[in-house]
A protein has these predicted regions:
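RNA pseudouridine synthases
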Residues: 1-151, 163-164, 173-174, 264-274
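Pseudouridine synthases involved in rRNA/tRNA modification
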Residues: 1-6, 177-178, 198-275
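A generic structural signal for residues embedded in beta-strands
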Residues: 33-35, 195, 259
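Short beta-strand micro-motifs in enzyme catalytic cores
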Residues: 53, 125, 179-181, 246
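Short beta-strand segments enriched for Tyr within beta-sheet-rich domains
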Residues: 112, 191-199
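Long C-terminal interaction/binding lobes of large macromolecular proteins
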Residues: 169
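Short histidine-centered loop motifs in beta-beta connectors
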Residues: 183-186
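Short solvent-exposed strand/turn elements
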Residues: 188-191, 264-265
Length: 275
């Protein structure tokens, strides 16, 4: 019964009246179930063992399908490779690229999720940010949901009564020709949009960020893919969010795993600037 309700909640059950959403409702006439058909594009794991795999997700790919009209997500790959018991353990935003952990079965999924909940997984990212970052520093600012009614629902904000959030920032390389710095960001907590919001808060916005540093109309235009590449670059600094998940470090079943990206993220960042 729970499975049937989940299908209704996702809008995958239709009758002659349309999509069946209401709980305990009686469907009329013929019943249609929308099943999820995998259409893989050939992505392969950069690391795998019996319990899990790690993929290098490209920017622009959803970690998880977001509705009936989703044409492609990482699940097209993982379900075609490992079956429908496989699932992503944590999510990366659509425009964030990099390493993402995939459990091959429910037992592994629950165990790996517990590692994230207990902050036993160390993560590091690379980001291309505006301005010159000259020294290492730590951003310790609490994060909460935005209370502004005219703002995008997913937008977060720095607020005194928010959840504790700490990010370490390390400058790697400065590019004087476009006044931007490649930094390594290490989140010590796991808040939504933590790295993006923290860097925006200290005046080092991640280039290409469609949400922080833009207004609602611009964000929606980017989300709906209504802007040209040049327009996107002019408004946000890059044609994509220049944020890449580079490393996962954790212990699982008595073994220590240190998994690094294999993508040339620096070249991809620079290409997205349109230079």
């Amino acid at each position: 019964m729970k499975g049937a309700q989940r299908l209704c909640d996702k809008g995958r059950v239709l009758d002659s009246s349309g999509v069946v959403l209401a709980k305990n409702s009686v469907a009329n006439g013929e019943i249609f179930l929308i099943d999820y058909k995998c259409e893989p594009k050939g992505a392969r794991a950069i690391f795998e063992c019996e319990e899990f795999a790690v993929f290098d997700k490209p920017s622009g790919v959803l970690s998880h399908p977001n509705g009936r009209h989703c044409k492609y997500s990482l699940y097209d790959e993982i379900w075609s490779l490992y079956g429908r018991s496989a699932a992503v353990v944590h999510r990366l935003d659509k425009e964030t690229s990099g390493v993402i952990l995939v459990a091959k079965n429910l037992a592994s999924l629950n165990a790996l999720k517990m590692l994230f909940e207990n902050r036993a997984v160390k993560k590091s990212y690379f980001a291309l940010v505006s301005g010159r970052v000259e020294r290492d520093f730590v951003i310790d600012e609490p994060i909460g949901e935005s209370l502004e009614t005219d703002e995008v629902a997913i937008k977060m904000r720095i607020c005194e009564n928010g959840k504790k959030a700490i990010t370490e920032i390390y400058p790697i390389e400065y590019f004087s020709e476009f006044n931007a710095t490649l930094v390594r960001a290490v989140p010590l907590t796991g808040r939504q949009h933590q790295i993006r919001l923290h860097l925006f808060h200290v005046k080092h916005k991640i280039l290409g960020d469609p949400l922080y540093g833009t207004d609602t109309a611009t964000f929606e235009a980017i989300l709906d893919e209504k802007l040209s590449v040049c327009e996107r670059i002019n408004l946000t600094g890059a044609s994509r969010l220049c944020l890449h998940a580079a490393n996962l470090h954790f212990e699982f079943n008595g073994k220590i795993y240190d998994i690094n990206t294999k993508s040339d993220f620096k070249a991809e960042f620079l290409k997205s600037l349109g230079i």
